[in-house]
Curated annotation (Swiss-Prot):
Keywords: Cytoplasm, Initiation factor, Protein biosynthesis. This is Translation initiation factor IF-3. It comes from the Bacteria. GO terms for cellular component: cytosol; membrane.
Length: 185
């Protein structure tokens, strides 16, 4: 029973994002475009199906919202393949931007600062955004100017490589700044 329902559900989902073809088209009249992209005007659905059958191709509803719907005579298998290929190419070209975080403390040593700075540069080269957070503990929060100085040092060290998306601001017991790679570089 479960397998049967699963097969029906899978077919229901996969058919929803495809255009209607051949006998699935419910309109009485359609605006027909043949395989050579020539307009035949408004035609009865039976005539359109006969023309598609004679050509050995399928009648595919291209624009279902038009009145009457626009249908084209073409190879539906090839149409699905090209559509799938186009979606795959678009997905491949998509760039996912990741937000990386680098945590600092107000009294960071020079060596640790340079190491973290080197890691931030790697993140920026990969095209990722970086959230720089400065954690204050106890009474360190009374000296926010130390945090601002640290962020200025970071900005100067990365000058020309970054674009500041969000300037330094306090959120609870931490100061945050978000940077991204400068596109010009």
């Amino acid at each position: 029973m479960y397998l049967f329902v699963n097969i029906i559900w899978r077919n229901f989902i996969s058919k929803n994002n495809l255009p209607k073809a051949n006998r699935e088209i419910r309109a009485r009249e359609v605006r027909l475009v043949d395989e050579n992209s020539e307009m035949h005007g408004v035609v009865n659905i039976r005539e359109a199906l006969d023309m598609a059958e004679r050509a050995g191709l399928d009648l595919v509803e291209i624009s279902p919202n038009a009145v009457p719907p626009v249908c084209k005579i073409l190879d539906f298998g090839k149409f699905k393949y090209e559509n799938k290929k186009r979606l795959h190419e678009a997905r491949k070209k998509q760039k996912i931007v990741v937000l990386k975080e680098m945590k600092f403390k107000p009294n960071i040593s020079i060596g640790d600062f340079e190491t973290k700075l080197r890691k931030i540069k790697e993140f920026l080269k990969d095209g990722d955004k970086v959230k720089i957070s400065l954690w204050f503990k106890g009474r360190e929060i009374l000296h926010k100017e130390v945090g601002h100085e640290l962020f200025k040092r970071i900005e100067l060290a990365l000058e020309g490589l970054i674009k500041i998306d969000q300037h330094a601001k306090m959120e609870g017991k931490q100061m945050i700044m978000i940077i991204s790679p400068d596109i010009k570089v």
